[in-house]
């Protein structure tokens, strides 16, 4: 792996020896949580888009969670960072793509709590000017390393390698998988489901569906578990933007069951609904349908959707509405990702450099 930049160290070594990572917590006492999200995030109708589609659409604005430029990943980080602190960890190692909103918010949160962040990205550093989230990582002085391989799975070995380096140096790292997709991380959206239930109680008609983009699967898993916990009648519909639908559904099912157990419940969970056909040219690359959907939302509601996740999920919802296959109010999770709007040509439909 190639080190892109190693910033100033702001964290002091922790006093505890725990460094098992995000998958190590056992059920029992309620998991600790740090307060990151400015909750509740708004739930509001999208009237002009609704008229365009002939279906009532509401936006759940998790692009307005608070830290940085907002985003859904803060919800899982409330539990993951709290667990790292409880284990006495002095550093956190995670990874994803070079334009990852997950790693950006993880790094910001770590810095706030005196934990040193380390980020592993697939691909190569390149020689051009950093843009979007990568530029923010560099500006913050975060240690970012590239695997030199195009496969996203190369990040997993990179996280393990950096974690090993830190342990060998006497540090106490907290490794977290890509996207924070662990049962503990999924608890963030179990909690969000309680928040959403209170907001939906004031509506005249309950929603029939809750739509979102699905990548690492933790957000959908938390929402599936949360819907079961709250007794919600809506269907949680994930639109995969990366992995095959069958693989995504399996991950959602496994994470949702484990998150429900951590939450102290054992509800009957429905089979995950994961839609496919909207990835376009590939993960991290805009699609024509996604860009058209994002432009429509911006022009009708003044809301920007990121090209990697939100735009593709909205394209699926729009297509289903126009085909007459969607009935009743639909909630769309706006999950953030604003920095990717300023990364290369992501917003115009060409692959970012």
Name these PLM-found stretches.
Residues 1-353:
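PLP-dependent amino-acid enzyme catalytic core
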